Regions:
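Long terminal segments
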Residues: 4-6, 11, 18-35, 42, ...
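N-terminal, post-signal-peptide region of Sec/Tat-exported proteins
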Residues: 40-76
Length: 147
């Protein structure tokens, strides 16, 4: 009886776990459709694909978040699945916002989340465009890691 109960629990967890994990992480792609970062939706931390935590999201209103680096620097805004830079161009986006994406490599193991420093001022909101910035996504997000 214990074996049957254990087997049922294992099957149930096995069928639920992939959906839970998928809902907890949101992959961000660069302008070329390569996965370069992801958001842990549990604590709103943005990790580079190598596992380095570089930024986090802070809710501004119902639909928009500010992206701050762990060094306190404002990096941009997250809105409708896109991270926009200060010039209003997209820096990275979720797959559903792109025409196509490339197959993703396995991510590296997550590093420990850093201590947040005091945030700097939020710049004026730009006009958001449907074009990608020339600045690479991982470079822009990586600016949040520097001290």
């Amino acid at each position: 009886m214990k074996f049957i109960y254990t087997t049922l629990i294992a099957l149930l967890l096995g069928s639920i776990a992939p959906h839970v994990l998928a809902a907890e992480e949101v992959t961000l792609f660069d302008r070329y459709g390569f996965a370069v970062a992801y958001i842990d939706s549990g604590n709103l931390t943005i990790y580079l694909w190598n596992g380095e935590p570089v930024a986090y999201l802070q809710r501004e209103n119902e639909t928009r978040f500010n992206a701050f680096g762990y060094n306190g620097k404002h990096l941009g805004w997250y809105l409708n699945g896109v991270i926009y830079g200060h010039d209003g161009d997209a820096v990275c986006a979720i797959a559903e916002r792109l025409n196509s994406t490339h197959e993703t490599d396995p991510r590296s193991r997550r590093q420990f989340v850093r201590i947040k420093t005091a945030t700097g001022p939020v710049p004026p909101l730009p006009v958001f465009f449907n074009t990608f910035s020339a600045a690479p996504c991982d470079d822009v997000l990586g600016e949040g890691a520097s001290r």
